[in-house]
Amino acid sequence: MSTDIAAEAPAVAPLRGSVVWFMALAAALGTSTIYPLQPAIADVAHSFDSSITAVGMALAFGPVGYMSGLGLLVPLVDRWSPRRVLGIQFGVLSLALALTAVISNLLVLGLLIGVAGACSVVGAGLSSVAGRLAPTHRRGTVLGIVTAGISVGILAGRIVGGWLAEEIGWRNMVLVFAAACAIVAVCSVLALPAVRGTSTRGYLATLRSLPGLLLRDTVLRLAGARGALWFFAFCAVWAGLAVALSEPPYAYSAAQIGLFALAGLSGILAAQAAGAWTDRVGARRVILVGLTVAGASATALTFALSSTIATLACLALFDAGLFAAQVANQSTVLAIDPAAPARYNSTYMLVYFVGGSLGTAFGSAAVELVGWSATVVVTAAAIAVAALITLSTGGASAGAGDELTQQKGQAGV
């Protein structure tokens, strides 16, 4: 199916290297806007003369908005030009953040955070652009670069947000993010491709088609299942880690716990490398290697917590393995319909995000109920199931990289 559709995809000018790196930068900024208020939650509560619990509920509108954006906004890049869709999204994101910095009503804060969360899906939109406009033989490489940008955003959002909030106050910190988004909005209009998507399906028809894609397409269904499993594991480990390290015998401060996120730097490097390897050896091999590394690291985390160095090493390998698997897995989704990949990517990311949300809830509660070791064993089991799905499906989970690898082998290359 994917081969036939790929053959019908219209020829477009390849993405220039400078544009790809701008896409990575834009993905980093857009993704980072979900996180900067989290380390400043106490300051926000004091500013609003409210409780941390109430502010936490307002911040919860961000993930809700993000899930809405995955379904409502990401498919737009199949129909309209990336510079138009993403330029507008960054503009609205900038406006929502600017208003967040000046309002004094907690309900309005929640609504604005929801709008910002919806527009912060620009990373998923840019991934879809990579799938549509990158040459087939470089799709994994380009996707790896964009995903590395998303990884930077996940890591930098909390760190930069917390630092700026401490230095200039949380309102000025949000204004800095708003100004950056305004600049990127203008640059998006100037730098991103102007080519319109070839999809003739109406917007409402596209939205109605999303649930059915999972039922009809085996590749999407398998990719979604294993992606949700390992994102469940990823979020459970990091959510559980914060709880475990905050309690005796560790009793680390929030700042000390936050420094463990630096282990996520490995994910940035792994994402970029995994893209190139996916183009060379195929998605399935990269997924299996990534899951093997992540599963072994999760198992080691059951007894590594007493050593900071061992914990950081395990977390670095854990993140690297899962980010590598994510790049390869997403490349199989984008290869299903290269002419209009956004609705497949939107559906995949929705399933993926649901897995992560369940993992966050599980990780925090499980450490309290059954302890750190039992929690991590469950995450390792989830990764093992994802690996078994990949092993058992064979060609059904193959993406464009796997097809190219097979063609090279048949040609004796």
Role assignments for model-derived ranges:
Residues A6-P14, P193-A225:
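Juxtamembrane intracellular "pre-TM" segments in multi-pass secondary transporters
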Residues S68-L106:
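Conserved MFS/SLC helix-loop-helix module at the cytosolic interface between two early adjacent transmembrane helices
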Residues G69-S81, A270-A283, V367:
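Helix-to-loop junctions at the C-terminal end of transmembrane segments
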Residues V85-A98, A178, R285-T299, A380:
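Structural signature of the two symmetry-related core transmembrane helices
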Residues I113-I150:
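Cytoplasmic helix-loop-helix junction between adjacent transmembrane helices
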Residues V122-A134, A324-D337:
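Intracellular juxtamembrane helix-capping segments at the cytosolic ends
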Residues I145-L192:
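Helix-loop-helix hairpin linking two adjacent transmembrane segments in secondary transporters
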Residues R285-N329:
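C-terminal transmembrane helical hairpin of 12-TM major facilitator-type secondary transporters
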